[in-house]
């Protein structure tokens, strides 16, 4: 018998080792669930929905429940416009005219340039992602066939869940149980994954979308708060009625795959700083568990 023969591991040892791994995984999942439930309790009756993934592992809480999207749809809208540019159906330098009749609340870019009477497609995309400009979103929605055209595009890239039914600012109504203008945390996080890991966008369009998300200023107190050294992040927030406060982020760790996190809150009256703190803790948990 050769001395180099591989050592035979007893079957009982293999089974015991496998059970230990399964037990550890179950314990970790239980700890995550407890953490998210504790965070949800801070909302005093509100709901928290979370899904985070690095493409291999994931974690979640109410991941398949519907939540009002509010402005988190705008990053996907910008991606749809970029996909049209990639397909030769749109150009970033095309000027889109608009006037006072197009104005709605929260217009940091379109309002500042109202006297100019037009802005480029690229400027509008940047505005809706970085500062969540509402008239800009409506102007771009018109170029893709409205909320229906946006939803049809989502179906074409594999999102069977997310739906947009109305325009800004009516889409932020957030009525309990209303399926209009909603998504699930799982659908949104996976949607971001398709944009950066799939074939939806060209490399140049992915870089442009990444720049806009990283340049966003509305979510610095949410998922991106207390970002560790060496990490990069971009996000798109959303806020609406009934305490609806959302954030969807992409994290780039110092090493390893991107992490996509969707965190949604609705049905609460706690102050904004409490809601932001819940999102910040979700971000911390996702980074700790998935990096």
Where are these regions (language model features)?
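N-terminal secretory signal peptides
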Residues: 1-9, 22-27
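Structured C-terminal helix/loop/strand segments within mature extracytoplasmic catalytic/sensor domains
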Residues: 3-16, 32-39, 143, 147, ...
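Beta-lactamase-like hydrolase cores
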Residues: 29-68
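Sec/Tat-exported extracytoplasmic proteins
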Residues: 43, 79-89, 100, 129-132, ...
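Mid-domain, small-residue-enriched loop/turn segments at the edges of structured enzyme/sensor domains
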Residues: 47, 138-192, 196-197
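Active-site SXXK
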Residues: 68-96, 261
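Short, glycine/proline-biased beta-turn/loop segments that scaffold the active-site neighborhood
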Residues: 87-113
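Conserved catalytic neighborhood of penicillin-recognizing serine enzymes
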Residues: 103-140, 147
